[in-house]
UniProtKB/Swiss-Prot annotation:
This is Holliday junction branch migration complex subunit RuvB. Mg(2+) binds at T68. Residues 257-346 are annotated as: Head domain (RuvB-H). It catalyses: ATP + H2O = ADP + phosphate + H(+). It is an enzyme of class 3 (hydrolase). It is found in: Cytoplasm. The gene is ruvB. Its main location: cytoplasm.
C-alpha cells in the first residue's frame, strides 16, 4: 500500500486544518480558474437580483483544485449558510432527508464525492432537486405510508473527481456544470505568495515560483510544499525562503522540477528498464511496482499523462521520449530519431 506522498493531491488532516486559515472567502480572492470564476459571478449576481436560490451546480475535476473552496466562496457570495457532507456519509434516505429538512431558504448543500451516493439516496434526491419535495416512507409492511415533505428552495453543489461515474439522471439535474483545470505555474505562484503572506512566512517571489512549478498544477500540493519548505527554512535558513532554500528543500523532499517524486520516477523507470518502454499492461505494471492497479490509474498516471511523459493505449502503457530524457537516458532511435541528449534530473 502506498504511503502518503508529499505530492499526493488527496487531502490530509493537516491540509484540512491549514486550508481553513488560508481559504479565500470571495470570488475576488479565488485565484485561477478564470472562466469558472467569471461565469459563477454572473450566476450568483443573477440569483441574488431575482431573490431566488441559485441553480444546482456540479463541479468536477482532479482532486486538490479547489472544489470545496469554491463551494464555500459561492455560499459566502450568496450570503447564505453552507452545509457540508459527502456521498459515503449519506448511507440511508433518512440521512439525506434530515439534511434537507434542516436547510433554510436559499441555503447551499455541498455533497463531496457525490458519485458515491447509493441508488436509494439518489432516488430521494431527484424530487428534492427538481420540485423541492421529498417522499418519506413511514412504518413497515402493510402499514407503511408515504409522506410528502415540502423543502425550502436550496442550491445543491455536487463535487466529484469521477464525473463519468455519475448516473445520467443525476447529472442531468444540474443546471450549472463546471470543470476545474490544472493551474498554471504563474497562478500557483500567486497562490503560494498569498498563502505565505497569510501564514506570516518570509518568502521571496523566486522562492514562491520554485515551489509553484513543482506543485503539479494543484493548489493543495503547492500549499503543502510551502509548509514543508517553511519547516526546512526555519531550521536551515532562519525562516527565510528564497530560490536556493526552496531548491534545497525540494532536494530533501525528493521532488524534482517536474513535480515528480520517487514513485513517479520508479514507474517510468520500470517501464523503460523492464518493458523496453512499453506497451505494458496495467496489471503487469502494478505487479512489477508492488502497487494496486487503482493506485496506478487514479494516483500516479493522470499527471504523467497530462504532462506528456506517459501514453495510455489499447495495448498498455508506453513512455514518451520526454520520459527517457527526464530519467537521464538516451532516447532509443526507433522511438524518436534525432531527439536531444539526456538532461539533469534535478
Amino acid at each position: 500500500m502506498t504511503e502518503q506522498r508529499i505530492i499526493a493531491s488527496s487531502s490530509t488532516r493537516e491540509d484540512d486544518a491549514a486550508d481553513a486559515s488560508i481559504r479565500p472567502k470571495r470570488l475576488a480572492d479565488y485565484l485561477g480558474q478564470q472562466p469558472v470564476r467569471e461565469q459563477m459571478e454572473i450566476y450568483i449576481q443573477a440569483a441574488k437580483a431575482r431573490g431566488e436560490a441559485m441553480d444546482h451546480v456540479l463541479i468536477f475535476g482532479p482532486p486538490g483544485l479547489g472544489k470545496t473552496t469554491l463551494s464555500h466562496v459561492i455560499a459566502n457570495e450568496l450570503g447564505v449558510s453552507l452545509r457540508v457532507t459527502s456521498g459515503p456519509v449519506i448511507e440511508k434516505a433518512g440521512d439525506l432527508a434530515a439534511l434537507l429538512t434542516n436547510l433554510q431558504p436559499h441555503d447551499v448543500l455541498f455533497i463531496d464525492e457525490i458519485h458515491r451516493l447509493s441508488p436509494v439516496v439518489e432516488e430521494v434526491l431527484y424530487p428534492a432537486m427538481e420540485d423541492f419535495q421529498i417522499d418519506i416512507m413511514i412504518g413497515d409492511g402493510p402499514a407503511a405510508r408515504s409522506i410528502k415533505i415540502d423543502l425550502p428552495p436550496f442550491t445543491l453543489i455536487g463535487a466529484t473527481t469521477r464525473a463519468g461515474l455519475l448516473t445520467a439522471p443525476l447529472r442531468d439535474r444540474f443546471g450549472i456544470v463546471q470543470r476545474l483545470e490544472f493551474y498554471s505555474p504563474q497562478e500557483l505562484t500567486r497562490i503560494v505568495s498569498r498563502s505565505a503572506a497569510i501564514l506570516g512566512i518570509d518568502c521571496t517571489p523566486e522562492g514562491a515560483a520554485e515551489i509553484a512549478r513543482r506543485a503539479r498544477g494543484t493548489p493543495r500540493i503547492a500549499n503543502r510544499l510551502l509548509r514543508r519548505v517553511r519547516d526546512y527554512a526555519q531550521v536551515k535558513a532562519a525562516g527565510h525562503i528564497d530560490l536556493p532554500v526552496a531548491q534545497a528543500a525540494m532536494q530533501m523532499l525528493k521532488v524534482d522540477p517536474e513535480g515528480f517524486d520517487e514513485l513517479d520516477r520508479r514507474m517510468l523507470r520500470t517501464i523503460v528498464e523492464h518493458f523496453d518502454g512499453g506497451p505494458v499492461g496495467v496489471e503487469s505494471l502494478a505487479a512489477s511496482l508492488s502497487e494496486e492497479r487503482g493506485t496506478l490509474e487514479d494516483v500516479i498516471e493522470p499527471y504523467l499523462i497530462q504532462q506528456g511523459f506517459l501514453i495510455r493505449t489499447a495495448r498498455g502503457r508506453m513512455v514518451t521520449p520526454k520520459a527517457y530524457l527526464h530519467l537521464g537516458l538516451k532516447v532509443p532511435r526507433e522511438r524518436a530519431p534525432g531527439i536531444g541528449e539526456p538532461g539533469d534530473l534535478f
